[in-house]
Every structure is written in C-alpha cells, then in structure tokens.
C-alpha cells in the first residue's frame, strides 16, 4: 500500500485544475490588510507566501524595505476582521496629522462650555420676570395703602414742600394763562388803533374843514399803538420767562419727585415682604428667602435715600431760582403797565432797556445770516 503523505490539519491549501496552488485568497487577504493599515507609519512592505504543505513551517514571511511613494488614504476599506477594524478605528480617531506629515496623539475628553456664553432669550425672559414681580409688589402696596391696610414711609417736611410746589405750579399756570389772554387782547387793540390812526390820517387829507381834528386823532392813535407795541413786548417777555419757570424748571423737579415716589413705593413693598418673612418660621427653606429679601430691601432702601436727597437739593435750588426770576419779572410787569397807562413813553422805553428787551419793528423782517456776518 502506498504511504499517505502527512497533511497539516491547521490549514488546507486549494489547488487549481492545472495542479498549481490557488493563492487568490492570500492575495486578497494581503491587499485588504495593506488597505486597512494606516499609510505613512514607516512600516516595511510585508509579503506573505506559502510553501509546500509537506514543509515543516506553515509559511515564510519575507520583509523588505518599503520602496515607492505611499499610497493615498482611501475613504473606506472593508477590514478582514471586525475586531481589527474597530481597533484601527479607535487608533485613527486619536491621531492628528499636522502639516509636516507627522502624526501626534491627542487625548480626547468631554467638551466644557464656558459660563460666559448666555442665551439672549433667557436674559430677556429673566428681565421680564423681575419686572413682573416688581410691578406686582408695587401694585399690591399701592392698593394696600389706598384701602388703609398697609403702612407707608412718610417724610413730613419733604411731603409738605412737595405739596406747596404742586399748588404753586397750578397758580403759576393760571397766571400764565391770564397773561397770554391779556397779550392776545392787547395785540388786537394795538392792531385796531393802528388801523384807526390810518383812517384818521386819510380823512385829514381829504377833509379840509376837519383837517386839524382828524390829524390830532391820527397822531394820538398812532402813539397809543406804538406804546401798545412796547407794552406788548414787555408782556411777552414776562410770559416767556414764567413759561420757562413753570414748564421746564418746575416740571423737571416734579419729574424727580415722581421718581422719588416710585422709589418710596418699592421700598415699602420690599419692607413689607421682609417683615412678613421675619414673622414666619425660620428653617432651612425660609432662611435663603429671608436673606434674599433682606438684600433686595437694602438695595431699595439705598435707592430711596438717594432719591430723597436729590429731591431735597432740587427743591432748595428751585426755590432760590424761582424767587430771583419772579422778582425781576414782576418788577418788569408792574413798571411797564404803570408807564403805559400813565402815558409816559420815556419811562416805558426805559423799562424795556432796563431788562434788555428788544422790540421787533413791524414790517421789518429779521436780518439774513449774511447781514449778521
């Protein structure tokens, strides 16, 4: 009997119909292994060849120096083993290829966002929430004060000064309204006197028998119209000064008073909240609320004290300015009226010069900017 050749049980080598070894699978494995390895790692070219099955070694691995340019990386390769592919993928994710061609390994970790990055929508929502809470507290405080249930902080001296200022403002507005009415009526009278003087002058030229009489009346009406224009200038100056005092200076002070009153309401509202929390139990849940309420109360107390000082200072300066302005304007008004009805033209003109009042000549337009230059 012919002796059978020993066979290796570890591997079976297929043979083609011509009796040659079928190494197509080995070439396919070598090609896949080359493609799966990362390019540019400085590895030598590896070739795996198989010898006869009757040899003592299963195969010989021949290694030589790598020659030629490295192949460009392929986008995706099917690895012969899933485990090897997963390991290569993990190694590839930690490799960074710089411009020089060398690979450096970096550590991957969780991404931490900076605290400075804020959402504008969340900021607006927070502002709306604070405004709504503050409005609710202030509204509740106002209703409680009107119903007589809540307490309010009162500065008796400052409140009295504010009440006097508001009352004086109403009276000054009434004087201003009456002075404007007088100015309108005086303007109509001056206009009528001027027309009447022109009519008398025309009749003086056409009526020879009454030439002198019409002439006297024409001169009188023209003189009255001239003096009326002078008085009208003084009254308009008085109106402008009082209007500035009432609608600008006093109004600015009253705006500060309104801010002071708003600060007072906020102060009382947060003071009431703090008092209610202090009357309740003190435990781990209420202590943070009490501390926050104490902080808000202190902030609004400082704001209230600041606004109260601002109102006191403005009221003091307003009183000094009001006395000075009204003193000059009342003297002007009295002297102009007295000189006009006394028929003292020189005294009337002297009064206007004393207060640096320039009258606009009727029928004369204002000079252009070229003439002023």
UniProtKB/Swiss-Prot annotation:
Annotated positions of the Phosphoserine modification: 5, 28, 36, 39, 69, 79, 132
Annotated phenotype, changing residue 132 to A: Complete loss of phosphorylation by PRKD1
GO biological process, one term: negative regulation of retrograde transport, endosome to Golgi
PTM annotation (N-acetylalanine): residues: 2
Gene3D superfamilies reported for this sequence: Arfaptin homology (AH) domain/BAR domain
Alphabetical list of SMART domains matching this protein: Arfaptin
Alphabetized PROSITE patterns for the sequence: AH (PS50870)
Subcellular location: Golgi apparatus; Golgi apparatus, trans-Golgi network membrane
Role this protein plays: Plays a role in controlling biogenesis of secretory granules at the trans-Golgi network. Mechanistically, binds ARF-GTP at the neck of a growing secretory granule precursor and forms a protective scaffold. Once the granule precursor has been completely loaded, active PRKD1 phosphorylates ARFIP1 and releases it from ARFs. In turn, ARFs induce fission. Through this mechanism, ensures proper secretory granule formation at the Golgi of pancreatic beta cells.
Subunit: Forms homodimers or heterodimers with ARFIP2. Interacts with non-myristoylated GTP-bound ARF3, but not to GDP-bound ARF3. Interacts with ARF1. Binds with lower affinity to ARF5 and with very little affinity to ARF6. Interacts with ARL1. Interacts with ATG9A.
Protein name per the record: Arfaptin-1
Organism of origin: Homo sapiens (Human)
UniProt gene name: ARFIP1
């Amino acid at each position: 009997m012919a002796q059978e050749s020993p066979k290796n049980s570890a591997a079976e080598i297929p043979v083609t119909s011509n009796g040659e070894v079928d190494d197509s699978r080995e070439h396919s494995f070598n090609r896949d292994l080359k493609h799966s390895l990362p390019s540019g790692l400085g590895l030598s070219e590896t070739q795996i060849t198989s010898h006869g099955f009757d040899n003592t070694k299963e195969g010989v691995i021949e290694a030589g120096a790598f020659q030629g340019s490295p192949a460009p990386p392929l986008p995706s390769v099917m690895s012969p083993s899933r485990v090897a592919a997963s390991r290569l993928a993990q190694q590839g994710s930690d490799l960074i290829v710089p411009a020089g061609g060398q690979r450096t390994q970096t550590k991957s970790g969780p991404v931490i966002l900076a605290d400075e990055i804020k959402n504008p929508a969340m900021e607006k929502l927070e502002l709306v929430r604070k405004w709504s809470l503050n409005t609710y507290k202030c509204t509740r405080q106002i209703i409680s004060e009107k119903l007589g249930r809540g307490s309010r902080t009162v500065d008796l001296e400052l409140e009295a000064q504010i009440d006097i200022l508001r009352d004086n403002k109403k009276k000054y507005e009434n004087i201003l309204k009456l002075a404007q009415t007088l100015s309108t009526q005086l303007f109509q009278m001056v206009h009528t006197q001027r027309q009447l003087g022109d009519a008398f002058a025309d009749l003086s030229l056409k009526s020879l028998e009454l030439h002198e009489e019409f002439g006297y009346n024409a001169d009188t009406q023209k003189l009255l119209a001239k003096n009326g224009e002078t008085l009208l200038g003084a009254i308009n100056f008085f109106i402008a000064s009082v209007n500035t005092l009432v609608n600008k200076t006093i109004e600015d002070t009253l705006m500060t008073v309104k801010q002071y009153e708003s600060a007072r309401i906020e102060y009382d509202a947060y003071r009431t909240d703090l008092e209610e929390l202090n009357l309740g139990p003190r435990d781990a849940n209420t202590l943070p609320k009490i501390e926050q309420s104490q902080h808000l109360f202190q902030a609004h107390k400082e704001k209230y004290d600041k606004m109260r000082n601002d109102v006191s200072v403005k009221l003091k300066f307003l009183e000094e300015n009001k006395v000075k302005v009204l003193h000059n304007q009342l003297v002007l008004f009295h002297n102009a009226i007295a000189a006009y009805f006394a028929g003292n033209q020189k005294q009337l003109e002297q009064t206007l010069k004393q207060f640096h009042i320039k009258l606009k000549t009727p029928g004369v337009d204002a000079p252009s900017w070229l003439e002023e230059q």
